């Protein structure tokens, strides 16, 4: 059974992402591990309280009580979605969020991470350094990131951007694995700029290789890469965008609200970020 880590602070963004996590667990036949972390108080050594252990125990107990109170609410959500059969376990940990996420991934052999994100600029804050954005750069497993505005709906069309590189082909195969489980179609976009070095022969080879797969290739000539990708998301009605998480700066530019007025409509799209260097092969992870 695949293991899906779901870090939560019980915020509206996290609660919204929880539904996506449940549905994703259903698709990959997985179980959810809910993680909640809390920070310990920081004291200067000069003023370190003698009763620190008492303070720690009190804080830990209050966090446990709060955590315990939230669990029934999540189970109620699972029941409402008819997904209460999904296996769930819980972990409460003190300390740094990213450190604990990496620790759980290693200890529990996590296959996927699902997190919610929120902010005035939607995906802009995600890629500019929120907890979610920091996590995506720190882990080596696929991560589904869900903005607050992204209410769950059946995924019919998955968008994937490519530059026709070998690493892109491997990633596309991984995306197709997931698409088949969702009974979804993959729309693969290549923005061909005036300086493109991708040959027509390469493009045709990909067309031939994936001819029997649920994927449609689109080659759009343009030097406005980011605008073209956003138009693609909108006009092809993309429900989930999949990208290799190797160029964070590109993500930042792509989802800047100032880039286009159309951003408001694209900021509600979940993003599945694949790492180039993964601890395990994604196809093996996704296969059920």
Features from the language model and the residues they span:
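Small/aliphatic-rich secondary-structure junction motif
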Residues: 1-54, 157-219, 238-240, 266, ...
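Helix-enriched interaction subdomains in cytosolic or periplasmic regions
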Residues: 112-138
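Short beta-strand elements of ligand-binding domains
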Residues: 116-117, 142-148, 271-275
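A short acidic, glycine-rich active-site loop
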Residues: 53-66
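Short, structured interface segments
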Residues: 132-150
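Structural beta-alpha unit
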Residues: 72-113, 210-261, 269, 276-288
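Short glycine-rich, flexible loops that bind phosphorylated cofactors or substrates
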Residues: 13, 121-122, 167, 249-251
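Charged helix-capping and loop-helix junction motifs
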Residues: 128-131, 202-204, 255-260
């Amino acid at each position: 059974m695949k293991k899906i880590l779901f870090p939560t602070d019980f915020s509206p963004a996290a609660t919204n992402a929880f539904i996506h996590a449940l549905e994703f667990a259903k698709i990959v036949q997985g179980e959810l591990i809910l993680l909640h972390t809390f920070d310990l108080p920081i004291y200067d050594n000069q003023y370190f309280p003698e009763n620190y252990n008492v303070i720690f125990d009190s804080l830990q107990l209050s966090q446990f009580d709060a955590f315990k109170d939230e669990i029934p609410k999540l189970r109620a959500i699972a029941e409402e979605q008819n997904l209460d059969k999904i296996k769930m376990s819980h972990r409460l940990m003190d300390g740094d969020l990213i450190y604990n996420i990496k620790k759980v991934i290693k200890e529990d052999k996590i296959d996927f991470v699902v997190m919610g994100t929120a902010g005035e600029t939607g995906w802009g804050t995600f890629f500019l350094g929120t907890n979610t954005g920091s996590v995506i750069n720190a882990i080596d497993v696929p991560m589904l990131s869900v903005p607050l505005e992204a209410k769950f709906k059946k995924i019919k069309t998955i968008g994937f951007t490519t530059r026709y590189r070998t690493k892109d082909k491997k990633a596309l195969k991984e995306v197709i694995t997931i698409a088949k489980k969702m009974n979804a179609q993959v729309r693969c976009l290549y923005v061909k700029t005036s300086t493109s070095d991708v040959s027509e022969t390469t493009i045709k080879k990909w067309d031939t290789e994936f001819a029997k797969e649920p994927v449609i290739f689109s080659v759009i000539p343009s030097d406005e890469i980011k605008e073209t990708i956003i138009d693609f998301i909108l006009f092809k009605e993309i429900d989930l965008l999949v990208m290799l998480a190797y160029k964070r700066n590109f993500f930042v530019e792509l989802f800047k609200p100032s880039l286009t007025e159309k951003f408001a409509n694209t900021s509600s799209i979940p993003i599945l970020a694949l790492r180039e260097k993964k601890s395990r092969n994604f196809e093996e992870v996704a296969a059920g």
